[in-house]
């Protein structure tokens, strides 16, 4: 027979009540998994309890099952875990291994949630820390539950569905230690006149007697209360149920519950005999409530902000509307509002707080890339873009670099969270880095001079700019976390350390950032982990002094084009540029044939594959045609009318000239600067070097392409006819020597052994030296 706990007659103060919800919403559909995880060995008993008869019918099996499951079912195990976690919390509060406190825990199977009610009282808890302790309390409870789940691993490994519940608990525990409860740990609260919520103390014994005790027992969602509760302990008006109850670590048996309730009601918590005023009896001469008091009670308690708070709200709205990020922006755009706020007590501090709130709002809603597009919404990538020109001069594919920058600024490039522009002076590295960060505007800088607080300016920023980066042993460890995008805590001047979330980093330097300097020694121990976190672009070519600065609009145009054309993720970057691994040194660009990186002649636009400039058609139409052939697919330059399409006639007639067997059949191409080529091919490709922008341009492009296609077909037919004529000429029989002689002007004399008659046009021809040599030693006729 179970031990009956003594009736609790005093409860430690102050007392608070908590509610813990089991962080697995589908617990009712998979309750059998909870039996296996928390109460291993009770699965068969729970199945048998489903088929038992309800009270008052006699059922020996039912009574035996209820006795055996008294404190072994999963509700009892959950109740014990919560009690142990509560004891641990109070020991932390009182700094004592054996805290002096009172604890009541009751587990219940609700309609939606599996939850536990906790009443705890004692020194160490107060209105100030009871509410803030919810996350810590939640983490301690989950740790106790996980520890009981691990006991199952001693007998067998987890099933897949059991492992799913276990990992859900582990994830919730990690979030709890980060201060996130997800609404699964709540405390009874009240709202004050200002609308703030505070922890509410309770009368623990009355709360226990009136709310927790009058409930019927139900230890499984498959069974019913009339199966688990005997008729002698049935609460008639109770609609809710409970699973298990612990009072200071001792279980409250089901058969003793009604007795316990009666003892509390009669001996411990008697009702008031007299009213609290005047010694009147109950319901005698109650005070009348006047109209004014009724009117006052119906007045709305909505909080009204004062003048200072209204000014702060207006300034915050202005910052969101006009994208104001620094104090100078406030002075330029809303000086009147700024002056009114400066006139308030502590106005400068209030302005800093408003700007800090706006920075937090921007960092939570935008990434560096999306905020850049938010500030520069409509931009087009032109061929005279200086960012495009600079990357081409340094030997890189500007489209590939833009793709990588989009991934890094959008926090989609994995562990490589940093872009480093390395090179000597006057190569454009600072020009490029400055254009990126000034386009984003909300950026922080690293200060080497303030050695104790190097990253003081990096919190609540979209991007970090590390100009002339130098790695020192004092800050190399936090630098590795920041360069890799790992969350870490940084020291801030005159404040506690703050959490720095993942923030992209832009570096421009001419130092070796992989060599760590410390004192009079240089170490390369950190070189490998630093290289895994950095993408380095080497700028080695010096720029002319007239190159100019890259504007924020130009860098935004390049990144916006890449963001619209490519999949800006790590996987998309690897697939687009055929890379198995992103190296530390960014790969150089490979230009298409005939495409140039010389930005002097850039009117024809840029190639969408290599980023190089298309060459000038006026300089060499042959290369333009070849480049166009690679970019236009099936339409070739010969098909678009580069040649005249006319067959050239031979200089001699068919009688006077016999064509060779291997004669060139195609008509010679027109010269590079011919009018026909300039009108057809070059004009077409100069007009359509980019995609049509709307439906009208698309229809015009299709019309011109169809005309050029028809011209190609007509030219093909002419070439086929020429080929047929030449084939017929080759099939004619070759003339014999006599016929050749007649064609050359020799006529046979008709008299035997007489030389032929030579026409007058050949009479003046003198024999050559070779002919003279043929008659040496012979008598000439």
From Swiss-Prot:
InterPro entries: BoV_NS1-like_N, Helicase_SF3_DNA-vir, P-loop_NTPase, Parvovirus_NS1_helicase, PV_NS1-NUC. Residues 641-650 have a biased composition (Acidic residues). A motif (RCR-3) lies at residues 211-215. A divalent metal cation binds at residues 108, 115, 117. ATP binds at residues 423-430. One of its GO terms (molecular function) is metal ion binding. This is Initiator protein NS1. Residues 606-781 are annotated as: Transactivation. The lineage of its organism: Viruses, Monodnaviria, Shotokuvirae, Cossaviricota, Quintoviricetes. Residues 621-635 have a biased composition (Polar residues). Residues 11-271 form the PV NS1-Nuc domain. Residues 621-679, 709-781 are annotated as: Disordered. Changing residue 566 to H: In strain: Eg/BSU-1. It is found in: Host nucleus. It comes from Primate bocaparvovirus 1 (strain Human bocavirus 1 type 1) (HBoV1). Keywords: ATP-binding, Covalent protein-DNA linkage, DNA replication, DNA-binding, Endonuclease, Helicase, Host nucleus, Hydrolase, Magnesium, Metal-binding, Multifunctional enzyme, Nuclease, Nucleotide-binding, Transcription, Transcription regulation, Viral DNA replication.
């Amino acid at each position: 027979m179970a031990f009956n706990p003594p009736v609790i007659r005093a409860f430690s103060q102050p007392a608070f009540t908590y509610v813990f919800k089991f962080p697995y919403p589908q617990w009712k559909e998979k309750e059998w998994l909870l039996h296996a995880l928390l109460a291993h060995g009770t699965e068969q008993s729970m199945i048998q309890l489903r088929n038992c008869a309800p009270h008052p019918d006699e059922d020996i099996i039912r009574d035996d099952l209820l006795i055996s499951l008294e404190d072994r079912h999963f509700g009892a195990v959950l109740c014990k875990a919560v009690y142990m976690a509560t004891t641990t919390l109070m020991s932390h509060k009182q700094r004592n291994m054996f805290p002096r406190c009172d604890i009541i825990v009751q587990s219940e199977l609700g309609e939606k949630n599996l939850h536990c009610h906790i009443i705890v009282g004692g020194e160490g808890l107060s209105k100030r820390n009871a509410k803030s302790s919810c996350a810590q309390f939640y983490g301690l409870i989950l740790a106790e539950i996980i520890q009981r789940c691990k006991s199952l691993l001693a007998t067998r490994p987890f099933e897949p569905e059991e492992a799913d519940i276990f990992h859900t608990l582990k994830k919730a525990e990690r979030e709890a230690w980060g201060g996130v409860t997800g609404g699964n740990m709540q405390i009874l609260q009240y709202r004050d006149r200002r609308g703030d919520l505070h922890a509410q103390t309770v009368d623990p014994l009355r709360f226990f007697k009136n709310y927790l005790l009058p409930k019927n027992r139900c230890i499984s969602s498959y069974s019913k209360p009339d199966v688990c509760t005997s008729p002698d302990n049935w609460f008639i008006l109770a609609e809710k149920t409970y699973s298990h109850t612990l009072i200071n670590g001792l279980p409250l048996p089901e058969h003793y519950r009604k007795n316990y309730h009666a003892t509390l009601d009669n001996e411990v918590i008697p009702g008031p005999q007299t009213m609290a005023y005047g010694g009147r009896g109950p319901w005698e001469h109650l005070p009348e409530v006047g109209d004014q008091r009724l009117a006052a009670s119906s007045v709305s308690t909505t909080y009204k902000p004062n003048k200072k708070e209204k000014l702060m709200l207006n300034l915050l709205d202005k910052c969101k509307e006009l994208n104001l990020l620094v104090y100078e922006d406030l002075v330029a755009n809303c000086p009147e509002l700024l002056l009114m706020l400066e006139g308030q007590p502590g106005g400068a501090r209030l302005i800093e707080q408003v700007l800090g709130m706006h920075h937090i709002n921007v960092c939570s809603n935008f990434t560096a890339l999306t905020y850049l597009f938010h500030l520069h919404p409509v931009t087009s990538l032109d061929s005279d873009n200086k960012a495009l020109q600079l990357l081409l001069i340094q030997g890189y594919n500007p489209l590939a670099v833009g793709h990588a920058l989009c991934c890094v600024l959008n926090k989609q490039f994995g562990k490589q969270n940093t872009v480093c522009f390395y090179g000597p002076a006057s190569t454009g590295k600072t020009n490029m880095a400055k254009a990126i960060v000034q386009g984003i505007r909300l950026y922080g800088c690293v200060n080497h001079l303030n050695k104790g607080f190097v990253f003081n300016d990096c919190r609540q920023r979209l991007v970090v700019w590390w100009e002339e980066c130098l790695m020192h042993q004092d800050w190399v460890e936090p630098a590795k976390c920041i360069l890799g995008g790992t969350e870490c805590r940084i020291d801030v001047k005159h404040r506690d350390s703050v959490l720095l979330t993942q923030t992209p980093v832009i570096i421009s330097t001419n130092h070796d950032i992989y060599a760590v300097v410390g004192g009079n020694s240089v170490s390369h121990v950190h070189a490998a982990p630093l290289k895994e976190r950095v993408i380095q672009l080497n700028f080695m070519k010096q720029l002319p002094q007239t190159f100019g600065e890259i504007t924020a609009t130009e860098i935004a145009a390049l990144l916006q084009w890449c963001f619209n054309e490519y999949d800006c993720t790590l996987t998309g970057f690897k697939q687009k540029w055929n890379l198995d691994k992103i190296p530390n040194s960014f790969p150089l660009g490979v230009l298409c044939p005939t495409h140039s990186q010389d930005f002097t002649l850039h009117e024809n636009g840029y190639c969408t594959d290599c980023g190089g400039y298309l060459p000038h058609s006026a300089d060499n139409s042959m290369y333009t045609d070849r480049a166009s052939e690679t970019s236009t697919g099936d339409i070739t330059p010969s098909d678009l009318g580069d040649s005249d399409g006319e067959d050239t006639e031979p200089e001699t007639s068919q009688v006077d000239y016999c064509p060779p067997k291997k004669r060139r059949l195609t008509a010679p191409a027109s010269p590079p600067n011919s009018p026909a080529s300039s009108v057809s091919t070059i004009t077409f490709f100069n007009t359509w070097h980019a995609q049509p922008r709307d439906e009208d341009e698309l229809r015009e492009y299709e019309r011109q392409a169809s005309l050029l296609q028809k011209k190609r077909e007509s030219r093909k037919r002419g070439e086929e006819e020429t080929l047929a004529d030449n084939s017929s000429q080759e099939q004619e029989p070759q003339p014999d020597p006599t016929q050749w002689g007649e064609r050359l002007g020799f006529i046979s004399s008709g008299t035997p052994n007489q030389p032929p008659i030579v026409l007058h046009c050949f009479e003046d021809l003198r024999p050559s030296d070779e002919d003279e040599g043929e008659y040496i030693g012979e008598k000439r006729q």
